[in-house]
Amino acid sequence: GRWVDDNGTDWSDFVSGPQAWRSGRPTGWNLLDHDLAVVDTFNNNQVSYVGGAMSVVTGVAVHPNSGDPVAIGIESFNEIRFEPVLEGVFAEVRLARWGSEETVVNLNPHTEGVHTLPPAERAKSVGDPRAIAFSSTGEEAWIASKGSNNVLVVDALGQRLGDPIPVGFGSTGLALNDDVAFVHNHFEGTLAVVDRAEREVSAVVSLFDPVPDEVQQGRAHMYDTHLHSARGEVSCATCHIDSRMDRLAWDLGNPGGSMQPIDVNCNMGVEQFGPDCPDFHPMKGPMTTQTMQDLIGK
């Protein structure tokens, strides 16, 4: 591959080629795009890699017939610069399969080409997928999504088999037998039993949840993709994975913006800092996602 900026300038010689030493890199330096490490336990534990499908892998399963690895996760579009260009479309929820059948699928095909959806269509989206499990025949895969509070059923290649099934707040864990799917709703502390034939919840078992009310209420603002995005598929946690980070850099400036004066005293009682805050510049430049853990009082 080549290292090209968004103006079409090729920097490969300076990144990985003969001039790489100028930036402290060895010739041949590269960034790997490995989504999964595949360990062959029948062949001296040899390790191979598959990738190129997504930025963050959030769940993995193995197809019961072919042995193909299948992953679910998030593909982020951080290569697109500037907030007005992105217009809120900065990530996609995906399923990828490698091996005998290779495919990469957008699990929300109804969102393609649009920046906003009415509530009824938004409810069909899945966001922040966390668990995937195949049926014993391999014809179905069930996907539990933490941000959209639902379960989606797809075929072996990731194509939807109907609309998502609402199951509970924070759907994180999943297990199947031939008759039902068991879904752990982490945020509300319940286990939902879903009838696989009827595609609806048949029973809910409450679990003990010691988390304080303040944390439970805050989870909706952090994770809920239907509540806080125009297409129903992203939330704060799309980039701040589990309140941490996606380890990506984003250039979210606004070339058409203006300086925003900050008229407060920011020296915190230290004269060397000066009396004023620096004004906010509309061009932030590339900035890496920061963790939100220990944000208050630490």
Task: Give each language-model segment a name.
Residues 4-28, 32-35, 39, 43-298:
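Periplasmic c-type cytochrome electron-transfer domains
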